[in-house]
Amino acid sequence: MAEIVPTVLCENAEDYKLTIERLSPFAKRVHLDLADGEFAPTKTVELSEMWWPQDWQVDIHAMVARPSLYVDALVQMRPSLVIFHAEVDEDLQPSIQQLKASGIQTGVGLLRPTVPNTVK
C-alpha cells in the first residue's frame, strides 16, 4: 500500500512548531528538509531546533555543504533515515558509516543535472 509522507520545509522555529503540531494528529512518518543556505539556496530551521513526536518515523533530507558537521547531532536525534547529496565537497563515507553504525538508514540524493553513473 502506498504511503503519503508529508514534507516539512520551514525557515524558522515558529513555523516548524506550527507545522509539526498540525501534522501530529494524523502523520506517523514525515520527511524533514534541512538546508544550510550554502549547499541549497534556501536556509531552513536549524537542526538544533528540529524535534518530532516520539512515535514518528522521520526521514531527514540534509541539503548541507558539510554533512560531517551534522552527523553527531543526527545520531543523537535518531531519525529513521538521513539523505545527503552526492555533490558535496567532502567524502560522504565516514558520515554514512557513523550513521549506519548507529542504526540509522542512509541514502544519497542527486541534483537534477548529476548523471547517476558519475557518482563514486
List where the protein language model places each region.
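Conserved N-terminal beta1-alpha1 strand-loop-helix module at the mouth
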Residues: M1-I83, E87-D91, Q98-A101, T114-K120
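Short glycine/serine/threonine/alanine-rich loop segments
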Residues: I104
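Active-site pocket-lining/capping segments in soluble small-molecule metabolic enzymes
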Residues: G107-L111
